[in-house]
A protein has these predicted regions:
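Short acidic DE-rich linear segments
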Residues: 196-197
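Conserved beta-strand/loop scaffold segments within soluble protein domains that form the structured core
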Residues: 2-163, 171-179, 184-192
Length: 197
């Protein structure tokens, strides 16, 4: 898929993006699932419009060694939509800035918004901004943000099972980033990883 300004009206699709860069603009008609896995993001902007009776699921993982800026914007212009955003970010070095904004416009009803955003600070820092702009009383909305380091107790537990510290960290990071994806997308990631070795 071309990484420059993709504009599409999508009916019932799953889009898998691996290490894509640039800006993306989509309009959801019925159902859209976007799986994104990016290593070494610099700047990425995604804007999605939901009109009526649609389901949008965004599963996004970002692993960064350099400073990056990620912007996810969803505009809900209609009624009876569901928007679920799952984000996992690992800041390996430098600063990572992530902004996730969902806006439900005035005079809309029956919409549901869920933002589940998690950051892992390895040797860098991560800032995650969950933004809900709600101009109506007729919406169910929730957001969750968790940021922290790898759990040293889990590393110690894996070491007690004979796994060295570096492999224990790799296992925990892989679990952290893969748990939002379905098996088909994980297979794509594993195939890509196998081809890069």
């Amino acid at each position: 898929m071309n990484s420059n300004n993709v504009n599409k009206i999508l009916m019932d699709n799953t889009i898998n993006l691996i290490n894509q860069k640039g800006s993306f603009n989509y309009e959801v008609k019925e159902k859209l699932i976007i799986n994104i896995f990016n290593e070494k993001d610099k700047n990425i902007d995604i804007t999605i419009i939901q009109n009526n009776n649609s389901l949008l699921i965004i599963n996004y993982t970002s692993i960064n060694y350099e400073e990056c800026h990620i912007n996810l914007n969803v505009k809900i212009n209609g009624n009876n939509n569901k928007c679920i955003i799952n984000f996992r970010g690992i800041a390996c070095e430098n600063n990572n800035n992530v902004s996730v904004c969902v806006r439900a416009n005035n005079n809309t009803f029956g919409n549901e918004i869920i933002e589940n955003l998690k950051g892992l600070c390895e040797n860098g820092s991560i800032i995650i901004k969950p933004i809900l702009e709600i101009d109506t009383n007729e919406v169910q909305a929730s957001h969750f943000v968790t940021i922290g380091p790898l759990d040293e107790k889990l590393i110690l537990y894996l070491e007690s099972k004979g796994i060295n510290k570096e492999n224990a960290k790799k296992i925990l990071k892989k679990s952290f980033i893969y748990n939002i994806f379905n098996d088909d997308f994980i297979s794509l990631l594993n195939d890509k990883e196998g081809n890069n070795e």
